Amino acid sequence: RLVGSEMCIRDRDVERAEKAPAARNDILAKRFGLPMEGYTYYFTYEETLPHRRQDFWQMPCALGGDLSQGDDFCSFVFLFPLRNGNFGVKTRNYISSRTLNKLPAAMRAKYEQFMQEGSLVILEGTVLDMMQVYDDLDAHIVHCGYDVRCFGYDPYNAKEFVERWAAENGPFGIEKVIQGAKTESVPLGELKKLAEDRMLLFDEELMTYAMGNCITMEDTNGNRKLLKKRYEQKIDAVAAMMDAYIAYKHNPEAFE
C-alpha cells in the first residue's frame, strides 16, 4: 500500500513520463525499477535542413566509411574542419542496380533525386563489388580535389577496402570504429550539438534524408548508439559522418 505523499510523487512521475517522452525511460528505470531502452529521433527537422551549396576544393578532410550493408548500401562522408568550429560535409553512397530495381516507386523517385545531385552512385550487379566502389570513390576524391588526412571505418565488411586504402595511402590516420554505445555516445552528442548550432554544413538531400531517419537508442546509463535495423529508412550516411568525426578527433595533428 502507498501512503498519500508517496502516491502524489508517483502520480507526478506518471504525468511527467506522459508529457516528456525523453524523461520517460529515466522515470521508469528510477521510480518503477523498469529498465527501458529509449528510441528517439535524434535530429529535429530544423537541424536536417540543407545549407546553401558549396565546394571544398583542395581542402583537408576526414573520411568516414560505413560499408556494413555491403549488399545493399555503402556510405562515405567527407568531413572538412573549417574556421570557427564549423564542418563542411559531403557524402557519396553506393547501391547495386539490383537494389535500385527492387525499390518501391515512391522510394525510387527519392533515390533518383539523390542520383541527380551526385550523392548516390548505382553500380551494375547483384551485390556491390568493393573494389569497384574503391575505384569510383578514389576517382571522385581526385576529381573534387579533396585532401583526405584520415579515414574512420566501421570494421564490418570493410577488410579488403581498408587493406587497399592502407596499401595506396599509407597506414597513418586509419581508425577502426567499433559500433556500440560505448564508442558512439560522445561523438553522437557532439554531432548533435553541432547540428543544433547549424555548424554541420551539408548541402545534399541524401544527408538531410539520413539525418531525418536517424533514430538512436539509449541504454539505462544514458549512453546512445545509432539504431540500424530499419532496412528502408537509411541512416548509413550519419554512421559514416560519425566515423569521419571520430577519425578527425583521434588525429588532430593531421590537421595542424
Question: What are these language model-derived features?
Answer:
Residues D66-G70, P81, Y94, Y153-A158, ...:
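An acidic- and aromatic-residue-enriched active-site/binding cleft used to recognize and process polar
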Residues F80-D147:
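Nucleic-acid-processing active sites and adjacent nucleic-acid-binding tracks
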Residues G145-N157, V162:
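Short glycine-rich phosphate-binding loop at a beta-alpha junction
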Residues L2-I9:
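Short, small-residue-biased leader/transition segments that mark boundaries at the very start
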Residues R1, R164, E168-F255:
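Metal-dependent DNA phosphodiester-chemistry modules and their immediately adjacent helices/loops
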Residues R16, P21-V77:
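Conserved helicase/translocase motor-coupling segment
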Residues D71-N84, I235-A244:
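Acidic, metal-ligating active-site segments
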Residues I141-C150, N169-I174:
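Short, surface-exposed connector motifs at secondary-structure boundaries
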